[in-house]
Amino acid sequence: MNIISVGVNHKTAPIEIRERISLSEVQNKEFITDLISSGLAHEAMVISTCNRTELYVVPAMHEVTGEYLKEYLIAYKDARKEVRPEHFFSRFYCGTARHLFEVSSAIDSLILGEGQILGQVKDAYRISAEVQAAGILLTRLCHTAFSVAKKVKTKTKIMEGAVSVSYAAVELAQKIFSNLSMKKILLIGAGETGELAAKHMFQKNARNIVITNRTLSKAEALAEELGTKKVLPFESYKDYLHEFDIIITAVSTKEYVLSEAEMHQTMMKRRLKPVIILDLGLPRNVDPDIAKLQNMFLKDIDALKHIIDKNLERRSAELPKVNAIIEEELIAFGQWINTLKVRPTIVDLQSKFIEIKEKELERYRYKVSEDELARMEHLTDRILKKILHHPIKMLKAPIDTANNIPSRVNLVRNVFDLEEPNQQH
């Protein structure tokens, strides 16, 4: 009983290869349905994101190997010219489980501890379940992976601390002003970086966000998306600087959008009430001399990257704890897999003894009263339970390797003269 994982990710292939081999949700469903309907797989799931496309397959025949699945996906995407098997990784048995646990707990992510991947794994499982491609093995594997991710999030700090510039800026603002909901925020620039910063602010309960941008319609669109509907014309935002506790700049410009003189006047109007300026521009948007002003907190990208580097160091320090959780769950999953392998023998063993019991009781059915027969049946049930306890316990006992399972199964089948499974079914 095998679970194979093959795929490409940020470790094995450049982005152009990952893009070429990725699957949309429609393609995902079509691909795994084809694997099942063609008799190649009992179960199948595909995780497909910008950083990875990975297959998780329970093969239905020995010919379905890792190499076979690589070629099958390449052929499905008609990508033989661009994609080669060397771009793929392969995992088998518990290696597959370990890999999915590492992916789900975000230690295999491009950015260590990036929590978005768990939702993507859950989406992959949902898609597989919707087309009836997730059976007992994948269902147990995925739910164990979800459990691993939950334990990692609650028992370690692998996902704590900002690791993007925009989020680091917001996290810093929250450390200085603990309650962002009470602060008035000006966002200068509604591009990708500014948009991310605004959305992170919104997630931290900041609601009083005013947006200005050279193209007013872009500012209005972002304001509407956030639900603030507060904008300022780019030509006049400097007239209102004194009203804001936090100013975020994220524009493409060769000239400073805020000068030391302008912010000196602003601080006078505010009576030195503290202001945070988060300069997310490259080149810098803000005159660095502003940092010399009293009660003015200025942080640029370099300062924020220093925070990010420290956070990544802290996350890396949590890896031993994460790996310990994964190891514990991997052992439990492996033991569960082993019980599946011995279950047919346990069922056959119980069935044989029940059949013997029923034949022997049938001989006395008309020789004793119903009460006596019931007592005999109760007694024989107890005897059978005790007789079968040790061989069943031996079959279920933890083992060092999967290779020991056939020897145990064969021993029990030979001792109790059980037919081979393929002769019975």
Curated annotation (Swiss-Prot):
<dbReference type="InterPro" id="IPR015896">
    <property type="entry name" value="4pyrrol_synth_GluRdtase_dimer"/>
</dbReference>
<dbReference type="GO" id="GO:0019353">
    <property type="term" value="P:protoporphyrinogen IX biosynthetic process from glutamate"/>
</dbReference>
<feature type="binding site">
    <location>
        <begin position="189"/>
        <end position="194"/>
    </location>
    <ligand>
        <name>NADP(+)</name>
    </ligand>
</feature>
<feature type="binding site">
    <location>
        <position position="120"/>
    </location>
    <ligand>
        <name>substrate</name>
    </ligand>
</feature>
<dbReference type="GO" id="GO:0008883">
    <property type="term" value="F:glutamyl-tRNA reductase activity"/>
</dbReference>
<dbReference type="InterPro" id="IPR036291">
    <property type="entry name" value="NAD(P)-bd_dom_sf"/>
</dbReference>
<keyword id="KW-0149">Chlorophyll biosynthesis</keyword>
<comment type="function">
    <text>Catalyzes the NADPH-dependent reduction of glutamyl-tRNA(Glu) to glutamate 1-semialdehyde (GSA).</text>
</comment>
<dbReference type="GO" id="GO:0050661">
    <property type="term" value="F:NADP binding"/>
</dbReference>
<dbReference type="InterPro" id="IPR006151">
    <property type="entry name" value="Shikm_DH/Glu-tRNA_Rdtase"/>
</dbReference>
<keyword id="KW-0627">Porphyrin biosynthesis</keyword>
<dbReference type="GO" id="GO:0015995">
    <property type="term" value="P:chlorophyll biosynthetic process"/>
</dbReference>
<dbReference type="Pfam" id="PF00745">
    <property type="entry name" value="GlutR_dimer"/>
</dbReference>
<feature type="binding site">
    <location>
        <begin position="49"/>
        <end position="52"/>
    </location>
    <ligand>
        <name>substrate</name>
    </ligand>
</feature>
<keyword id="KW-0521">NADP</keyword>
<dbReference type="InterPro" id="IPR000343">
    <property type="entry name" value="4pyrrol_synth_GluRdtase"/>
</dbReference>
<comment type="subunit">
    <text>Homodimer.</text>
</comment>
<feature type="active site" description="Nucleophile">
    <location>
        <position position="50"/>
    </location>
</feature>
<dbReference type="InterPro" id="IPR036343">
    <property type="entry name" value="GluRdtase_N_sf"/>
</dbReference>
<dbReference type="InterPro" id="IPR018214">
    <property type="entry name" value="GluRdtase_CS"/>
</dbReference>
<comment type="similarity">
    <text>Belongs to the glutamyl-tRNA reductase family.</text>
</comment>
<comment type="pathway">
    <text>Porphyrin-containing compound metabolism; chlorophyll biosynthesis.</text>
</comment>
<feature type="binding site">
    <location>
        <begin position="114"/>
        <end position="116"/>
    </location>
    <ligand>
        <name>substrate</name>
    </ligand>
</feature>
<feature type="binding site">
    <location>
        <position position="109"/>
    </location>
    <ligand>
        <name>substrate</name>
    </ligand>
</feature>
<keyword id="KW-0560">Oxidoreductase</keyword>
<dbReference type="Pfam" id="PF01488">
    <property type="entry name" value="Shikimate_DH"/>
</dbReference>
<protein>
    <recommendedName>
        <fullName>Glutamyl-tRNA reductase</fullName>
        <ecNumber>1.2.1.70</ecNumber>
    </recommendedName>
</protein>
<comment type="pathway">
    <text>Porphyrin-containing compound metabolism; protoporphyrin-IX biosynthesis; 5-aminolevulinate from L-glutamyl-tRNA(Glu): step 1/2.</text>
</comment>
<dbReference type="InterPro" id="IPR036453">
    <property type="entry name" value="GluRdtase_dimer_dom_sf"/>
</dbReference>
<feature type="site" description="Important for activity">
    <location>
        <position position="99"/>
    </location>
</feature>
<dbReference type="InterPro" id="IPR015895">
    <property type="entry name" value="4pyrrol_synth_GluRdtase_N"/>
</dbReference>
<dbReference type="Pfam" id="PF05201">
    <property type="entry name" value="GlutR_N"/>
</dbReference>
